[in-house]
Curated annotation (Swiss-Prot):
Gene Ontology CC terms, in alphabetical order: cytoplasm
PROSITE patterns to which the protein is assigned, alphabetical: GLYOXALASE_I_1 (PS00934), GLYOXALASE_I_2 (PS00935), VOC (PS51819)
Organism whose genome encodes this protein: Salmonella typhimurium (strain LT2 / SGSC1412 / ATCC 700720)
Family: Belongs to the glyoxalase I family.
Protein name (Swiss-Prot/TrEMBL): Lactoylglutathione lyase
Length: 135
């Protein structure tokens, strides 16, 4: 397994991109918009997503701020097969909260589990890891 990204919800995507790129020296790796589900994404990091963990900045259209209680999104891990990973996690007492399947609006196969504290961990099939929504 490999750490892929950490998602942060932001109230102003351009302000956040400027901070991570100009202040912290990260590169803007890619952006996308999903008009159907009304959100925009920006991925920033120090290297390519295929080699380095990155930050996913998510702007939900019309939402300008979050309280710290809901600002955390998830940690993502690369797995060879999401369904098999879910089964191994379940067999070891883990809590699978979303079975392996395509992400909304795309074809990338993902699943979600929770750690003992309830933090969400996304499992992304390695073959799809750098494809975003799989478009």
């Amino acid at each position: 397994m490999r750490l892929l990204h950490t998602m942060l919800r932001v109230g102003d995507l351009q302000r956040s991109i400027a901070f991570y790129t100009n202040v912290l020296g990260m590169k803007l790796l890619r952006t996308s918009e999903n008009p159907e589900y009304k959100y925009s994404l920006a991925f920033v990091g120090y290297g390519p997503e295929t080699e380095e963990a990155v930050i996913e900045l998510t702007y939900n259209w019309g939402v300008e701020s979050y309280d710290m209680g809901n600002a955390y999104g998830h940690i993502a891990l690369s797995v060879d097969n999401a369904a098999e990973a879910c089964e191994r996690i379940r067999q070891n007492g883990g809590n699978v909260t979303r079975e392996a399947g395509p992400v909304k609006g795309g074809s990338t196969i993902i699943a979600f589990v929770e750690d003992p504290d309830g933090y969400k961990i996304e499992l992304i099939e390695a073959k799809d890891a750098g494809r975003g929504l799989g478009n």
